[in-house]
């Protein structure tokens, strides 16, 4: 069987616009800048979180995505600090309005005991490759979803978001 080769042809201005969306995605997560994140996402997203214990949503409305990401039990918790560090990427053109980005990612997480951010409660870092989906909406590239593939985790990654919740 002959493997189909990906279409690697992108116009340079599209490449630069996609790189900016990628940077804004990661940095808005880390800065908890929900307005910036909202400005770069498509009206609907494909979110495949099966590898991290959740489910797949094929047509998640933008506001549902924003609510999930910014929730106090997820990235919205002020005691959870992150850095989504991007490694190498390659880009697959699906059509003039759709691109899949393949990105190496290290997501460092630290959970603090309280909002003073003085004492680290635990840390957990994820190492993954992500498929990011990009869609051109009204002539502008938007983030349209993701599918992480976890390679390995460090420390107590599985406890990061549970640990941020008050003990019962």
From Swiss-Prot:
Fenoxanil inhibits arp1 scytalone dehydratase activity. The keyword Metal-binding does not apply. Its EC number is 4.2.1.94. One of its GO terms (biological process) is conidium formation. GO terms for cellular component: endosome. Pfam families: Scytalone_dh (PF02982). It catalyses: scytalone = 1,3,8-trihydroxynaphthalene + H2O. It is an enzyme of class 4 (lyase). Pathway: Pigment biosynthesis; melanin biosynthesis. GO terms for molecular function: scytalone dehydratase activity. Keywords: Conidiation, Endosome, Lyase, Sporulation. Substrate binds at residues 29, 49, 130. Disruption phenotype: Impairs the production of dihydroxynaphthalene (DHN)-melanin and results in reddish-pink conidial phenotype. Up-regulates complement component C3 deposition on conidial surfaces. Causes enhanced insect mortality compared to the parent strain in a wax moth Galleria mellonella infection model, probably through exacerbated immune response of the wax moth. The active site is at 84, 109. CDD domains: NTF2_like (cd00531). It is found in: Endosome. Scytalone dehydratase; part of the gene cluster that mediates the biosynthesis of dihydroxynaphthalene (DHN)-melanin, a bluish-green pigment and a structural component of the conidial wall. The first step of the pathway is the production of the heptaketide naphtopyrone YWA1 by the polyketide synthase alb1 though condensation of acetyl-CoA with malonyl-CoA. The naphtopyrone YWA1 is then converted to the pentaketide 1,3,6,8-tetrahydroxynaphthalene (1,3,6,8-THN) by the heptaketide hydrolyase ayg1 though chain-length shortening. Belongs to the scytalone dehydratase family. Homotrimer. Each subunit contains an active site, located in the central part of the hydrophobic core of the monomer, which functions independently. This is Scytalone dehydratase arp1. It comes from Aspergillus fumigatus (strain ATCC MYA-4609 / CBS 101355 / FGSC A1100 / Af293). The lineage of its organism: Eukaryota, Fungi, Dikarya, Ascomycota, Pezizomycotina. The gene is arp1.
């Amino acid at each position: 069987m002959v493997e189909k080769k990906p279409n690697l042809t992108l116009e340079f201005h599209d490449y630069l616009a996609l790189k900016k969306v990628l940077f804004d995605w990661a940095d808005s997560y880390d800065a908890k800048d929900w307005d910036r994140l909202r400005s770069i996402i498509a009206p609907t997203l494909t979110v495949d979180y099966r590898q991290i214990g959740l489910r797949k949503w094929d047509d998640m409305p933008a506001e549902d995505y924003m609510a999930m990401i910014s929730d106090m039990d997820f990235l919205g918790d002020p005691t959870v600090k992150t850095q989504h560090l991007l490694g190498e990427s390659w880009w697959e053109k699906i059509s003039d309005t759709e691109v899949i980005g393949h990105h190496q990612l290290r997501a460092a997480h630290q959970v603090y005991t309280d909002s003073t951010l003085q004492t680290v409660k635990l840390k957990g870092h994820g190492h993954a490759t992500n498929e990011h989906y990009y869609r051109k909406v009204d002539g502008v590239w938007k983030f349209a979803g993701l599918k992480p593939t976890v390679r390995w985790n460090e420390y107590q990654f599985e406890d990061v978001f549970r640990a941020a919740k008050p003990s019962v």
